[in-house]
Regions:
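A residue-level detector for the "anchor" residue at the start of short, highly conserved motifs
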Residues: 2-3, 14-305
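Sec-dependent signal peptide hydrophobic core
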Residues: 5-8
Length: 305
């Protein structure tokens, strides 16, 4: 009987220990989780307020033929608008909507090339009119504008306007960000903010703080800013808060910080953006005093200390 009693007591202690040890929520180190793949070329095309057309990498087809403008999708994840008539009247509008975990390349009817980043939207005429070329941007895009002195090119982004003749530049104007930024790689643009005009030369970056209304023009590494369109992350002395916003758009995850101080830590590094999320976070954690853990689609960033 004494042995039976001891066994019963031990069983009770074991189950009590199990109950105390049961976790309420389990966060798994990123290196141990199922890999989260990077983004890829994909978008939605809406023409003349019609039905949305899904665009995916690997498909090659004619999407539409509207009043002499042929719309072609190629297999590499791009779309081009071919103006076969060369007419001067503007015909309808199209929008290319790129979701999180996406990117897309578009050639407009005048030959202008546009790389559209994730979580962004570009609206433009199917064919430009005779006086101006005007597009609207939400989010981020890199432009290589076909030169035409007769038709200035404008990018409308929120309350700002970029005026171009023929040049290569990047515009970042995400609605949820606190700033709008224009970075000029080559050529010349003017950045119009309300009643002020800022003229940029290559290598300059104009940043509008949308909260204070202040605009700052500075020299910077524009090549690093536009590296995203060449398939690379290039983080130059970037805060973890800003860095994780970029990662969240590309990988479709949410980042949360265990400590406000962690947001201010800075990171520099460059890598391909087509690696899995765990690879990218592992590279960051090796050179920064932070760890990453994931539950479902939420990544928690914590200090190692």
């Amino acid at each position: 009987m004494r042995i039976v009693a001891i066994i019963i007591v031990l069983i009770g202690v074991f189950f009590a220990w199990q109950i105390r040890q049961a976790p309420t929520e389990k966060f798994i180190p990123v290196a141990e989780v199922v890999k989260i793949e990077s983004g890829s070329p994909k978008a939605i095309l809406v023409m003349n307020a019609g039905e949305p057309i899904e665009l995916k990498e690997g498909e090659s087809r004619q999407v539409a033929d509207v009043f002499g403008v042929k719309v072609i999708q190629d297999s590499t994840g791009g779309l081009r608008f071919e103006d076969r008539e060369g007419a001067e009247e503007e015909i309808g509008k199209s929008s290319v909507i790129v979701p999180e975990k996406g990117e897309y390349f578009v050639i407009l009817s005048d030959g202008t090339k546009v790389w559209i980043n994730s979580d962004s939207e570009l609206e433009f005429p199917n064919r430009f009119g005779e006086d101006i070329r005007e597009v609207k941007l939400k989010g981020e895009a890199y432009f290589e504008v076909t030169s035409d002195s007769r038709k200035p090119f404008y990018v409308l982004a929120g309350e700002t306007k970029v005026h171009v003749l023929g040049t290569a530049f990047n515009v970042s104007a995400y609605r949820e960000d606190r700033q709008t930024e224009v970075a000029l790689l080559r050529g010349k643009v003017s950045f119009d903010v309300k009643d002020k005009v800022y003229v940029l030369v290559p290598g300059e970056i104009a940043t509008l703080n949308r909260e204070s209304g202040e605009t700052i023009v500075r020299k910077g590494d524009v090549a690093a800013i536009v590296d995203w369109k060449a398939g690379r992350f290039n983080f130059e002395d970037m805060s973890l808060e800003e860095l994780t916003v970029k990662l969240s758009r590309w990988y479709g995850v949410t980042f949360v910080f265990s400590d406000e101080a962690v947001k201010k830590l800075r990171f520099s590094g460059a890598m391909t953006k087509y690696r899995t999320l765990d690879y990218v976070l592992d590279m960051i954690s090796k050179t920064t005093d932070v760890t990453f853990s994931l539950k479902e689609n939420r990544v928690t960033v914590s200090s190692k200390k």
